[in-house]
């Protein structure tokens, strides 16, 4: 038997001590979703509070809480419908789907395969003789798949909507409101700590790949012709 990895050991301890566990366990579970237990919930809340204290309250930045579901036109304008995609491959034998770049990285140890482009990803699957990790079957040629949750807004299907995969759109959509609230002065920032959803092809990495999670994001707006920052002197001597 292969030795257990440190990640597997820590994950098991976290589940046993009530930090988190797989969601929907009594119905067989579903990959990509977790439920935070008592300790996990408290830890998560503490992290969020520290983030808000350091990045938001101390700087006098503004907070938002915007809807998770957005109309389709928002993501058409942002380019998400065209670009928020990943290469998916399917097993010809068992029908299981996988991220093509992830399979290549796991087999070869290569990094950032996604950035290599579709043709290189397709050729690597063949060159490396990569097969289905579940049953050993042959894999189909990968295709681009949109990894956003699609829904209908309105009980009778009035308008197409999507669950946001990140919170940045909310800050840009509400820039004018934030600018007015900031007394029409820059720089100012909008911050948000909220749920997002990503319809991952094959979330097989525990907490590292989830279909629903909380993201903490901040957008700083400034005048490009006068990009001075009143907080720069606080960190000007820091080495990166």
Question: Model-derived features: where do they sit?
Answer:
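TRNA-recognition modules of translation machinery and tRNA-sensing kinases, especially anticodon-binding
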Residues: 2-240
């Amino acid at each position: 038997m292969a030795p257990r990895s440190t990640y597997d050991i820590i994950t098991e301890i976290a589940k046993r001590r009530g930090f988190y566990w797989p969601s929907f366990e009594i119905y067989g579970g579903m990959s990509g979703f977790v439920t935070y237990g008592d300790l996990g919930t408290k830890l998560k809340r503490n992290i969020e509070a520290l983030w808000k204290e350091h990045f938001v309250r101390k700087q006098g930045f503004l907070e938002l809480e915007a809807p998770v579901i957005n109309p389709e036109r928002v993501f058409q304008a942002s380019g998400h419908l065209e670009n928020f995609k990943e290469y998916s491959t399917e097993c010809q034998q068992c029908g299981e789907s996988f991220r093509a770049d992830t399979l290549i990285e796991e087999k070869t140890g290569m990094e950032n395969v996604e950035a290599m482009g579709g043709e290189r990803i397709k050729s690597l699957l063949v060159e490396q003789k990569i097969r289905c990790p579940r049953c050993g079957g042959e894999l189909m040629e990968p295709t681009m798949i949109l990894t956003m949750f699609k829904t209908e807004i309105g009980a009778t299907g009035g308008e197409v909507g999507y669950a946001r995969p990140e919170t940045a759109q909310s800050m840009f959509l509400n820039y004018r409101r934030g600018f007015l609230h900031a007394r029409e002065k820059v720089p100012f920032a909008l911050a948000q700590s909220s749920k997002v959803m990503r319809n991952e092809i094959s979330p097989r990495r525990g907490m590292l790949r989830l279909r629903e999670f909380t993201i903490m994001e901040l957008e700083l707006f400034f005048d490009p012709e006068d990009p001075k920052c009143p907080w720069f002197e606080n960190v000007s001597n820091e080495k990166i």
